[in-house]
């Protein structure tokens, strides 16, 4: 099973400012030695070895993850603005010829999880087939409403690909061919669902938009079947611990330390910090990752091989 991140921000898309780009250039030039910039080849090598936060960015698109199963199924989780770039890549293959098929699971319909759908090119191509899955019984109505003429010039019905909607039950498995999928309601204003994908003996769990606090971690056993035996856990860490527990409590998001507590409790093999606040710079995200790793090192219950990463656009995992 292969997992690729196309959108990693929460709330709304964001771009780098001119000042941020200038600071990255200044940082790179300050680090560089004469030999690093003596030729185009040496420059490219130098840039390739710079930290991501200097040579690039974690990304500003909202949530979208591509999952490719071992049997070739394509599962798209959430359709924030990141799905636009995914769609452009898909158009270079079968989807550009009207021969593509994919499954889309939507965790909920807050805008940062659906705002890329009107611009998802494969949906415009006749012959392509899309199956939409969600525990939300009125998902189709919600998606169609996003594209009424007062909001968008092209209606959802005008997108010529085949579109079928399936309502799945929370806390129960459903199947896409040989893939087992389990959804679970998450604590979030307006409602949200996490998704657990089992492909053979590999398990991927995605929990975007969920608010757990210290007390919830002590009383989380309702989530045992959802979080157990996870190879890769993607978790909402939009806020710092102070924001999650004080400044923005009840806004619907968690912190890295809470994510780590849950990942360690359920012995997840790898944790990915996700759904970044749009106001956070790359430097801020670096600090969050550094603090998270320090927290892991101080956690006596964390296994030696437990790893934590921070999501960025283009990040891939092979399970």
Walk through the language-model features, giving the residues of each.
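Binuclear metal-dependent hydrolase catalytic cores
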Residues: 1-205, 215, 224, 282-319
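Active-site flanking residues adjacent to catalytic metal/cofactor-binding acidic residues
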Residues: 77, 107, 207-208, 235-237, ...
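Cap/insert and terminal regions of metallo-dependent hydrolase folds
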Residues: 214-307
């Amino acid at each position: 099973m292969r997992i690729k991140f196309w959108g990693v921000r929460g709330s709304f898309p964001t771009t780098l400012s001119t000042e941020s780009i200038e600071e990255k250039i200044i940082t790179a030039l300050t680090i560089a030695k004469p030999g690093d910039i003596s030729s185009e080849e040496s420059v490219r090598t130098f840039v390739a070895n710079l930290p991501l936060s200097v040579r690039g960015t974690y990304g500003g698109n909202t949530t979208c993850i591509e999952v490719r199963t071992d049997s070739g199924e394509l599962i798209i989780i959430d359709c924030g603005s990141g799905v636009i770039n995914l769609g452009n890549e898909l158009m270079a293959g079968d989807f550009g010829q009207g021969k593509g098929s994919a499954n889309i699971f939507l965790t909920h319909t807050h805008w940062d999880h659906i705002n890329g759908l009107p611009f998802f090119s494969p949906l415009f191509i006749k012959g392509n087939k899309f199956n939409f899955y969600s525990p939300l019984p009125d998902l189709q109505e919600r998606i169609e409403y996003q594209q009424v003429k007062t909001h968008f010039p092209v209606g959802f019905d005008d997108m010529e690909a085949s579109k079928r909607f399936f309502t799945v039950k929370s806390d129960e498995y459903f199947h896409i061919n040989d893939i087992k999928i389990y959804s679970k309601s998450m604590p979030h204003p307006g409602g949200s669902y996490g998704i657990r994908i089992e492909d053979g003996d590999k398990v991927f769990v995605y929990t975007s938009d969920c608010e757990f606090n210290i007390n919830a971690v002590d009383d989380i056993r309702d989530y045992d079947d959802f979080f157990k035996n996870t190879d890769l856990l993607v978790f909402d860490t939009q806020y710092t611990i102070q924001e999650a527990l004080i400044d923005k409590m009840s806004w619907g998001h968690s912190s890295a330390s809470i994510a780590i507590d849950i990942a360690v409790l359920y012995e997840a093999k790898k944790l990915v910090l996700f759904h970044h606040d749009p106001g956070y710079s790359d430097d801020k995200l670096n600090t969050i990752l550094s603090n998270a790793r320090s927290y892991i090192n101080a956690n006596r219950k964390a296994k030696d091989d437990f790893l934590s990463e921070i999501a960025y656009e283009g990040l891939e995992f092979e399970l």
